[in-house]
């Protein structure tokens, strides 16, 4: 016959060193079995194989069968398992001791740093669904005196007991005079006190000869947020929880109202302005506020937009919008 190649050639297997080795149970059992068989040949009482001669045919031939000694094999397995169990238990005790020492060291470090020893602390990140809250960076808003961001004053008054917006104003070299309306706006901002006990965001308002109101929220890269409406959205997301509307069922409705405000501020004719006001009236319907029964950032956006549109008088407003404006004025105080 022709010779076949070996399917599993003999080669050295490199065993990993990251884990401790275990004894080979089968090899150990074979070695014990071979040792016991050699010793059993000297004694008939401890023999592992018993020969039974039975005459099974007429020719007188004898058949020999080997009976396995299960008791001896069971004792060998128990002895092997006992040795391995003892070594595993010793290693486990060593690991537990090391963990106790590590726990004691961490306790000393925690005590030295003055960290609370509670195993679990409910933080604000746990309460808002896992969002990580970090200290807010100071923001800078560039605005033209002809397009005063009244939303800053409205939010500052509305959040008087919830959140502090610390606004400081400066004048850019491109502006010779900011005008009486901007100066009155600065005076009204200064009248609202800053409560140091409340969370705060610092806003630097720079009167500048710019086309759009823009906000820079990052001190490292110039990524502006254009438009007063989008600035309201940003402040609504970082402001008090009462005015955060992402988790509200009226989230889409509030965003839609703010979009209408954005279009209203860009209307060039009185006819288009009145058309946008009619859309706002449809969104308000019979509600007290655009966000339902409570004041929201949508109301702040609408109120500020109407102030910036002097051509839209009270005659252009529906009775529902007139009643809403009176209620909102009590909150924003403008």
UniProtKB/Swiss-Prot annotation:
SUPFAM superfamilies associated with the record: GST C-terminal domain-like (SSF47616)
Domain of life: Eukaryota
UniProt-annotated location(s): Cytoplasm, Cytosol; Nucleus
Entry keyword annotation includes Kinase: no
Record bears the keyword rRNA-binding: no
First-listed, main subcellular location of the protein, grouped into a coarse class: cytoplasm
Pfam families in UniProt: Thioredoxin_16
UniProt cross-references to Gene3D superfamilies, sorted A to Z: 1.20.1050.130
Keywords assigned by UniProt, alphabetized: Cytoplasm, Nucleus, Protein biosynthesis
A GO cellular component entry from the record: aminoacyl-tRNA synthetase multienzyme complex
InterPro entries recorded: AIMP2, AIMP2_thioredoxin, Glutathione-S-Trfase_C_sf
Domain GST C-terminal: 280-327
A GO biological-process term: translation
Known function: Required for assembly and stability of the aminoacyl-tRNA synthase complex.
Subunit: Component of the aminoacyl-tRNA synthase complex which is comprised of a bifunctional glutamyl-prolyl-tRNA synthase, the monospecific isoleucyl, leucyl, glutaminyl, methionyl, lysyl, arginyl and aspartyl-tRNA synthases, and three auxiliary proteins.
Full protein name: Probable aminoacyl tRNA synthase complex-interacting multifunctional protein 2
Source organism of this protein record: Drosophila melanogaster
């Amino acid at each position: 016959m022709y010779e076949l190649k070996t399917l599993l050639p003999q080669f050295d297997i490199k065993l990993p060193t990251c884990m401790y080795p275990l004894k080979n149970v089968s090899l150990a059992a074979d070695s014990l079995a071979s040792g016991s068989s050699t010793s059993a040949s000297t004694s008939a009482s401890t023999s592992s194989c018993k020969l039974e001669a039975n005459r099974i045919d007429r020719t007188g031939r004898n058949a020999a069968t080997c009976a396995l000694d299960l008791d001896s094999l069971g004792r060998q397995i128990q002895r092997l398992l006992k040795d391995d169990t003892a070594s595993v238990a010793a290693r486990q005790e060593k690991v537990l001791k090391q963990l106790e020492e590590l726990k004691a060291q961490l306790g000393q470090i925690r005590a030295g740093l003055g960290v609370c020893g509670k195993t679990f602390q409910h933080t604000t990140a746990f309460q808002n669904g896992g969002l990580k809250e970090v200290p807010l960076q100071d923001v800078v808003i560039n605005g033209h005196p002809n397009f005063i961001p009244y939303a800053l004053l409205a939010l500052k008054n509305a959040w008087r007991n919830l959140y502090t917006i610390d606004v400081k104003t400066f004048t850019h070299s491109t502006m010779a005079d900011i005008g009486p309306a901007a100066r009155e706006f600065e005076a009204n901002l200064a009248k609202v006190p800053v409560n140091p006990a409340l969370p705060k965001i610092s806003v630097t308002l720079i009167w500048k000869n710019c086309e759009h109101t823009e906000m820079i929220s990052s001190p490292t890269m110039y990524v502006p947020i254009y438009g007063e409406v989008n600035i309201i959205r940003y402040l609504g997301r970082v402001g008090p929880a009462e005015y955060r509307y992402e988790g509200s069922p009226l989230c889409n409705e509030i965003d839609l109202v703010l979009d209408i405000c954005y279009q209203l501020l860009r209307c060039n004719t009185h006819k288009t302005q009145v058309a946008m006001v009619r859309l706002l009236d449809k969104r308000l319907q019979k509600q007290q506020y655009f966000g339902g029964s409570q004041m929201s950032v949508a109301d702040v956006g609408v109120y500020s937009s109407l102030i910036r549109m002097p051509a839209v008088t009270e005659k252009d407003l529906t009775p529902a919008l007139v009643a809403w404006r009176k209620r909102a004025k009590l909150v924003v105080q403008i």
